[in-house]
Amino acid sequence: MKGLLTSLITVLTFTGLQAQSLPAAPKLVVGLTIDQLRTDYLEAFSSLYGEKGFKRLWKEGRVFHNAEYTFCGIDRASAIAAIYSGTTPSMNGIISQRWMDASTLRPVNSTDDTAFMGYYTDQTVAPTKLLTSTIADELKIATQGKGLVYAIAPDCDAALFAAGHAGNAAFWLNPNTGKWSGTTYYGEFPWWASQYNDRQAIDFRIAGMTWEPIFPRGMYTFLPDWRDMLFKYKFDDDRSNKYRRFIASPFVNDEVNALAEEALNKSSIGMDDITDLLALTYYAGNYAHKSVQECAMEIQDTYVRLDRSIADLLEVLDKKVGLQNVLIFVTSTGYIDSESPDSGLYKVPGGEFYLNRCAALLNMYLMATYGEGKYVEAHHNQQIYLNHKLLEKKELNLAEIQQKSAEFLMQFSGVNEAYSANRLLLGSWTPEIYKIRNGYHRKRSGDLVIDVLPGWTIVNENGGDNKVVRHSYIPVSYTHLTLPTN
């Protein structure tokens, strides 16, 4: 990830030096992060695209292929925090959307902060758990606070980590009301966003929204689909989840564009010679987080609509600011939602792994070895947290207990490797440990990290979604676009 962002800085400097003797800063930097964008799909579906979206980026921009996040356990929160901070979870602290708070033994959200109230939401959130500065913060410092920073995203974590600590505002969609939301952390909610909520928000329009394929069925041939009928969704059919379904559809990208256009029309962003930042997040995942097997046609249509959303965004930027005054970068979050387990019919290796059962058996093993006590305090997201106070009371060596626990966990079916915190922090370097170490934060991660074999399903018996482990990664195409002044 550091290499990716270093490339961005090099391009900015090199482009400016070639153009003139003194580097000209852009009026507006637009960061477009596309959640769950897959490079293989992006290229496979290219015959369905127009000339003004992805193809324009490819022709007129500069593309960096095969970029890879250098840490494990990527999700939306950790990816966007890495993009905008330029460093890994081991430094920025955002190891995932949720992690276990060792002091309370309860999962916490990466954005939770009860010190701040919400606008158009009952969420109390802020970017305070992000431990490093971001592009937005550094822009504010460089411009002595004069550069404007707005972040617009379907989801709260994406907006907050893109806006950083010093941004002017972060906006995300309330999944219960469809209104654009914000936090008092950034001060007053902008008047133009309130006006949009009161007059044009999707709650006024969603009843009439229907999603059908743009093209005839015969054009969606890139993924196997066994259905004979075209899909048709009315978001309003499921009244209790209509906004959640909308947020997990390609229509949300047009809503992001709509609020971005409001900012360009009614604020001063991009209007003077002081560089501003507009950080946007799109969605390119499966509809309503279904598997590809369930919605092959939908995912192809999603990329068609995504291409058109990008074309619309470029047109708005050209009209309002002039693309010659804009630097745009486009990248992906580098992960995808978990897919369905492989069918046993095809004899693909796999099975089910239960972290809660694994933690219970580990506690029994430690009791048999060291005497009565609750040695395992908690477990979460393939990590196990040990009871440090009990170990201190019994005068047991933490590193030794971690190592013995890791060796015990290695005996479980489905476990590829178990890493102790001591090994991750102080052990010798290997390519595997390097990526896990980069995703590990000593104050937020567990004592033990379990690497489950590919093809196995991590079953959550306490509620929540199950997860199928895949060890392949989706390369992150990074695109930079600047257009020369005519």
Task: Cite the ranges covered by each PLM segment.
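Conserved small/polar residues in nucleotide/adenosyl-binding loops
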Residues: 479-485
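Short, structured active-site-proximal loop/turn typified by the sulfatase FGly-forming signature C/S-X-P-X-R
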Residues: 42-91, 148-152
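Second-shell loop/turn segments in exported
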Residues: 38-44, 69, 121-126, 245-250, ...
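Secreted, luminal/periplasmic, and some membrane-associated catalytic domains
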Residues: 49, 75, 97-124, 132, ...
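His/Asp/Glu-rich, glycine-adjacent segments
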Residues: 87-88, 93-274, 283-290, 407-413, ...
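Structural recognition of the beta-strand scaffold that forms the well-ordered cores
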Residues: 30-33, 64-66, 82-84, 148-153, ...
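Bacterial Sec-dependent N-terminal signal peptides
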Residues: 1-25
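Mature N-terminal segment immediately following signal peptide/propeptide cleavage
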Residues: 23-42
